Structure formats: C-alpha cells, structure tokens
Amino acid sequence: MLELNFSQTLGNHCLTINETLPANGITAIFGVSGAGKTSLINAISGLTRPQKGRIVLNGRVLNDAEKGICLTPEKRRVGYVFQDARLFPHYKVRGNLRYGMSKSMVDQFDKLVALLGIEPLLDRLPGSLSGGEKQRVAIGRALLTAPELLLLDEPLASLDIPRKRELLPYLQRLTREINIPMLYVSHSLDEILHLADRVMVLENGQVKAFGALEEVWGSSVMNPWLPKEQQSSILKVTVLEHHPHYAMTALALGDQHLWVNKLDEPLQAALRIRIQASDVSLVLQPPQQTSIRNVLRAKVVNSYDDNGQVEVELEVGGKTLWARISPWARDELAIKPGLWLYAQIKSVSITA
C-alpha cells in the first residue's frame, strides 16, 4: 500500500496529494504537461523532497517532513523507468541488467528476461538497440532490483508508433505476471486504456479524480480529453463460452452476455472492453430477426443534451453504458430515468 499525504511547491502551483493506492495493478497518473505528474513520482522515488507531509510504502516511512525523515532513493526499494532508457553505453545488455540486481532476484533473471523478450539482446551494446528494445531492458533492470513499487515516467513518449505497438504487449504481460504495483505516468489515452487498472487525474497539482479506470473514464473529468464523438464506455467482463462453429466468444456482463469474434482466452478470463456511445442504439421492445448479435436489457439512469445530441446513461448489469441518440429519438422513445429498454450494440473492442 502506498500512502500519499504531502504537498510540494511547483512554480506557481502546489502539488497536493492525499490518496492511498493499493499494492497491486497499474495506476495511471494522467494530465496535461505541467500538471504535476512527474513531480509526483519524483517525490515518491526520493529525487525531490516534499516540504510538508508523509509518504509511506507498505508501512515504511519514505518521507516525513515534520520528523525530518527522507530516505535516499537507493533505500526506498522503488524502481524507476525514465522516458529515455538511461542505459550504461559501455555495458552490454546483460551487464546493464545485472547492475544493481538484488540477490533475491538472481533466480528470477532468466524468467524476467524471457518475459520481456530480451534474451537475444543480452550480448549487444545499447547503441545497437531500437528505442523499444532499450525500454524493455530498462524495465528489466528496474525490476531486477526487487522493488516494492515500479515508477514509469512516460516510457513510450519518445518512441514512434511502431515501437509503441512493439512495447505495449510486454507491458500488458508484466501487469498479468509480475505482482508489483506500478505508477504509470502518461498523457496518452490509448496507453491508459490498454494498461491501467486505476487512474489519477492531476490538474495544476490537484487530484481531480481517482478511481477505477471504468469509473474515471466515464466521468465529466475526462471531457476535455475525450471529444463527444469519442464518448465511450469501459466495462469489465469475463469469458463465458466459445462458439466454435461461428468462431465467436461470449463475454459475461452481469447476468447477460456479449458476443465478439473468437478470442484465444480461457473461460473465466477477465477482460476489459470498450463500446463507443455512437455504436449503441435504443429500442423499447426486443428486436426480432436482427443481424445485431448484442441486444442488452438496460435501464435509463439519466440523459443529457449536448450540442444537438443526447447522451443517455444506462445501467447494464450494475455497469454504466453510454448511448448517443438524437433529440427526436429521445422524445419518440420518451427517454426518462427509470425506463427499461434494450440497447443494441453494433461493435465491441477489446482493450485489455
């Protein structure tokens, strides 16, 4: 568990944090440049020293301004991956990985190297590596120090699109197989969507929102980053069954299910899906003989007028689903809170 209760001056603003983060999964730190994202993880790592408050990791006090406690970075058991890999140019990859390696990680070396796909790189110098390869090595080096927490400061920011696509699957694999909590700084919605379990949104050094990805994603806090045409719902689902004849997979959403193209995932595997609001249409009665495979019973929570369109908030299996319809459709269907209807979903994308 990471307990953050501190403040630190940032130019004209003050970074003020009072949150407790669980000791698992990835928490994305999101916001515009200058919001305080990097300053937050620098304070956690010990690169900077807050003027007030405390930082506590798994019961160990890293910072306590009133008591004058400030552990040096090497004593914090916190790994840090920067935007630029910062590898030692005169060491081969193997030497970079072993630099600072904890004795407790010696037996894990081969497993971690395989997990990151860097075994073919072990005898190469950093100068011969691509940007994505360098970052994989940097992540491996940080993990081999046996940290209790891993900080990643926009690790994909300096990479071109092909290299980002190369690295994302490795990061997704790490979240599933390495039981180390991570703080992932980013201003990329795509990275957050594919990696984060939770999101903390910072603005001018203040926490504007903090919670599960699916909750924060659907909140008004994200409106500045999500154009209305990109309004969507993020939902947690599990694999229910596979239909081999039609090559389809059913995903459980509460006591209902969604069909998607066949997935190579075991039954009960947990996944996250994204449904665009523009891909959801509403009907009052269950349609007959329709080509749309996904028709879900839903209850209207509320509706909001927005520049000639209507955003309808629905509840499906205890989850929030958004639909975008016209004012004409709203009036004709008599949309109001508490109304039960059917949501027809034209498209579903898997995010994680």
Swiss-Prot record:
Q: Does the keyword Transport apply?
A: yes
Membrane topology field: Peripheral membrane protein
Domain ABC transporter as annotated: residue spans: 1-229
Task: Keyword check for Nucleotide-binding, yes or no.
Answer: yes
What cellular-component terms does GO give this entry? Answer: ATP-binding cassette (ABC) transporter complex, substrate-binding subunit-containing; membrane
Q: Which reaction does it catalyse?
A: molybdate(out) + ATP + H2O = molybdate(in) + ADP + phosphate + H(+)
What is the predominant subcellular site recorded for this chain? membrane
Q: Which Gene3D superfamilies match?
A: 2.40.50.100, P-loop containing nucleotide triphosphate hydrolases (3.40.50.300)
Give the record's keywords alphabetically.
ATP-binding, Cell inner membrane, Cell membrane, Membrane, Molybdenum, Nucleotide-binding, Translocase, Transport
Q: Which GO terms describe its biological process?
A: molybdate ion transport; tungstate ion transport
Query: What is the enzyme's main class?
Result: translocase
Query: Residues of the signal sequence?
Result: none
Q: What is its EC number?
A: 7.3.2.5
Q: What does this protein do?
A: Part of the ABC transporter complex ModABC involved in molybdenum import. Responsible for energy coupling to the transport system.
Question: Assembly and interactions?
Answer: The complex is composed of two ATP-binding proteins (ModC), two transmembrane proteins (ModB) and a solute-binding protein (ModA).
Q: Which family does it belong to?
A: Belongs to the ABC transporter superfamily. Molybdate importer (TC 3.A.1.8) family.
- Recorded protein name is Molybdenum import ATP-binding protein ModC
Q: Please give the organism.
A: Escherichia coli (strain K12)
- What taxonomic lineage is listed for the species of origin? Bacteria, Pseudomonadati, Pseudomonadota, Gammaproteobacteria, Enterobacterales
The gene it comes from is: modC
